[in-house]
Amino acid sequence: MKIAWIGTGVMGASMAGHLQAAGHELTVYNRTKSKADALLAGGATWADTPAEAAEGTEVIFTIVGYPTDVDQVFLGHDGILNAAACGAIAVDCTTSSPALAEKIAAAGEAKGIAVLDAPVSGGDVGAKNAALSFMVGGDAEAFEKVKPLFEIMGKTVVLQGGAGAGQHTKMVNQTLIASGMIGLCEAMLYAEKSGLDPLTVLQSVGGGAAASWGLANLWPRMINDDFEPGFFVEHFIKDMGIALDEAKRMNLELPGLELAMKLYTKTAELGYGRKGTQALLLALREINKG
């Protein structure tokens, strides 16, 4: 299948690599070309714009940074919807605004292009291991057509509803993670301060009621002072901002999410915005120096 892939960062490069390894023909675009080097070395074709990437392909995947990027990639002068063929399917895996997902889906429908919102969970580890969870919103027929592609990249693929439903589900996911990360990093700080060995602590708590993806994957990184990004702090702040905006629109108060937003904003202010979400530990250490 001819596939366009737009966005070859921490997540996108691995995801696209699985499709390439499965024998699909890729055309790729990324703002920084060097981040697509591995895919190009594997036989992918380079495109200079999202529109050029989309032209003549059957399916277009995108995973970029911010809603403004999504808007530009789809609706801009050199955007996907100005070049994709009628009957093509576009899939946005960026965590973005539900309202924007609905807007782009409607614009695509007017041109005969089905657009699915399909944000993912699982981080860099899930992307590398083809173990991502896809939360999908959009047309059911289009979903069934591209489901085999999702299954190459992930282990859980669920259609949640119409356009925007995938993004709403991702907001649920990020709300769960937000409070969980506070607990994870505070627990590490407590273990350190009390003189415990965090590794043996993990052996005790990792199989009980406190078990979680973060505990299994991020606790060992923190033990090794590895704060490199599986998911950037600055992108998590973006996600929480979207969730809080949606909550406000629905007249919801989410104090746990608001606290996480405050703490992660502090983390970014301390210079850790391009570190992984586990860098909240560094901010908590700073807070406790006072």
Q: For the regions a protein language model found, what residue spans apply to each?
A:
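NAD(P)-dependent dehydrogenase/reductase Rossmann-like domain
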Residues: 270-290
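Interdomain hinge/lid region at the active-site interface
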Residues: 167, 211-275
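Active-site-proximal catalytic alpha-helix in oxidoreductases
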Residues: 130, 134-137, 158, 162-194, ...
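Rossmann-fold dinucleotide-binding core
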Residues: 96-175
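Residues in the short beta-alpha loop(s) of Rossmann-like NAD(P)-binding domains
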Residues: 32, 66, 139
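NAD(P)+-binding Rossmann beta1-loop-alpha1 motif at the extreme N-terminus of oxidoreductases
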Residues: 1-62, 88, 93-94, 124
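Rossmann-like NAD(P)(H) cofactor-binding subdomain of soluble oxidoreductases
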Residues: 50-54, 59-60, 67-132
